């Protein structure tokens, strides 16, 4: 699962049992948890391939213990649909099923649904704290290989500390923005500094 769709109970189980796995690649966008799958002791067992290098994974990428595949977010659906990233197991958080047996992927649909539709196996953390969203967010329970019920708060991305460099970049960029402009911002301290 991507961002707040990351299933913490499943990720914790994967990390806790890492010695059972050999050369497993974890393809992930925005990591929200601790990123323990990037710990040096995971070598030979779990290897992270980050599509967005965030706090928990940055050091591992810099030290060569994890990979970075740059991409545009709008490409994420295609990457999983066209086989660029073949998925053996998709791990996601979902809502409890409705009376018709449909679960919602909740707050992070993006490439998560194509990953589920193209994975050989889908393991879902059924989380009653995941909000049900409408649109293309639904899977039927028959599309899930395995479900684990666990009520956990959704992961949240905390704000980083804006340092002198980010402050200077933010001032520079902000000086280029005209009054009344519409801004589309990314994640991190530099976009935060631009808004400041």
Which stretches of residues belong to each language-model region?
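Conserved alpha/beta enzyme-core scaffold
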Residues: 1-196
């Amino acid at each position: 699962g991507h961002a707040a769709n990351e299933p913490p109970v499943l990720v914790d189980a994967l990390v806790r049992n890492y010695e059972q796995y050999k050369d497993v690649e974890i393809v992930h966008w925005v990591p929200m948890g601790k990123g323990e799958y990037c710990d040096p002791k995971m070598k030979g067992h779990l290897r992270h391939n980050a599509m967005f290098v965030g706090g928990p994974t940055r050091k591992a990428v810099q030290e060569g213990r994890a990979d970075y595949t740059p991409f545009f977010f709008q490409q994420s659906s295609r990457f999983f649909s066209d086989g660029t990233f073949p998925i053996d197991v998709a791990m996601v958080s979902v809502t409890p099923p409705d009376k018709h047996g449909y679960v919602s992927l909740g707050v992070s649909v993006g490439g998560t649904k194509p990953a589920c539709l193209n994975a050989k196996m889908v393991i879902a953390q059924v989380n009653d704290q995941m909000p049900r969203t409408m649109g293309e967010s639904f899977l039927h329970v028959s599309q899930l290989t395995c479900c684990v019920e666990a009520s956990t708060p959704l992961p949240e991305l905390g704000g980083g500390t804006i340092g002198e460099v980010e402050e200077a970049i933010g001032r520079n960029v902000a000086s280029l923005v005209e009054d009344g402009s519409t801004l589309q911002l990314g994640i991190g301290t530099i976009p935060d500094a631009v808004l400041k």
